[in-house]
Amino acid sequence: MLQYQIDRIDHQTANDRSQTGTFLIGPLERGQATTLGNSLRRVLMGGLEGSAVTAVRIAGINHEYATIPGVREDVLDILLNCKQLSINSSNPELEIGRLVVSGPMEVKANDIQFSSQVEIVDGDKPIATIQEGHNLELEIHVERGVGYRPVDRRNQETTSVDLLQIDAVFMPVKRVNFSIDETAVAEGGTGRERLTMEVVTDGSTSPDDAIAEAANQLIELFQPLATVTMVEEIPEEPEPSPEAQIPLEELNLSVRAYNCLKRAQVNSVSDLMGFSYEDLLEIKNFGSKSADEVIEALERIGISIPQSRTSV
């Protein structure tokens, strides 16, 4: 199999602390670049775990359409600013940050007090502007997750009235682009390909770590296919036909034949289906006339039994 390598050929950090990494992967066999690019892009955009603000509590506010005295931004603006925070939490459980400030002040993300397990990537992100003589008190909930989680309206009814839920975007990768170009033709005329990938993150993780995590997820996904084991299917027992469930009484046999069969522990048509004509004749006091009677009764419901027992 052709061995390829991956090189990071460019890395940039923007003012908002988002990071862009460009990677060159190759040489690859024809068609492999598309497979690799699509697989990595899908995992990078939707499969990586990240952190996000999931709820905000504002003192004195119980719905998102309110305004706060002495604060330039309304509640919706503050919620949007909190939602856009780039945060990296190493705690798998809920983290709660708090903010208690007095104006005049322009509140920024760095003013929010979290535990040491939470890192605010873009500390200069504006949150709110407070006028002199007014206060602002916030409680911000941060969780880890994967993908996008909309507000659960049913859960909202059971939570505190003043806890404002936010649609959470846990995706640390903001954008992935890739392009494919052909390289030198190999011996025998087979073309080679080279994959160029551009990965843009929100700064809570680096493009290098994002690529590595996506690759590890794909390895875990495909690893079981390398050790496929054949499982022998156990044939299912055929369900008995309705006729087999008919009790012996409904065959309308003579009293003699009925009593002989009962003594032989024959209680239904299903039991009779295990007998041959010869087996019937071996039942005590069961003559050919009784055996013929049983054969005729079974034929009336569409069942026949063999003339002689099957030799094993």
Swiss-Prot record:
Gene Ontology molecular function terms on file: DNA binding; DNA-directed RNA polymerase activity; protein dimerization activity
Lineage: superkingdom: Bacteria
Entry-linked Pfam families: RNA_pol_A_bac, RNA_pol_A_CTD, RNA_pol_L
Protein family per UniProt: Belongs to the RNA polymerase alpha chain family.
Gene Ontology cellular component list: cytoplasm; DNA-directed RNA polymerase complex
Coiled coil: none
Keywords, ordered alphabetically: DNA-directed RNA polymerase, Nucleotidyltransferase, Transcription, Transferase
Domain commentary: The N-terminal domain is essential for RNAP assembly and basal transcription, whereas the C-terminal domain is involved in interaction with transcriptional regulators and with upstream promoter elements.
Region: Alpha C-terminal domain (alpha-CTD), residue numbers: 240-312
Catalytic activity: RNA(n) + a ribonucleoside 5'-triphosphate = RNA(n+1) + diphosphate
Known role: DNA-dependent RNA polymerase catalyzes the transcription of DNA into RNA using the four ribonucleoside triphosphates as substrates.
Start and end residues of each stretch annotated as Alpha N-terminal domain (alpha-NTD): 1-229
Protein name, as recorded: DNA-directed RNA polymerase subunit alpha
EC number: 2.7.7.6
Keyword Transcription: yes
Subunit comment: In cyanobacteria the RNAP catalytic core is composed of 2 alpha, 1 beta, 1 beta', 1 gamma and 1 omega subunit. When a sigma factor is associated with the core the holoenzyme is formed, which can initiate transcription.
One record GO biological process: DNA-templated transcription
Cross-referenced InterPro entries: DNA-dir_RNA_pol_insert (IPR011262), DNA-dir_RNA_pol_RpoA/D/Rpb3 (IPR011263), DNA-dir_RpoA (IPR011773), RBP11-like (IPR036603), RNAP_asu_C (IPR011260), RNApol_insert_sf (IPR036643)
Family annotation (NCBIfam families): PRK05182.2-2 (NF003516), PRK05182.2-5 (NF003519), rpoA (TIGR02027)
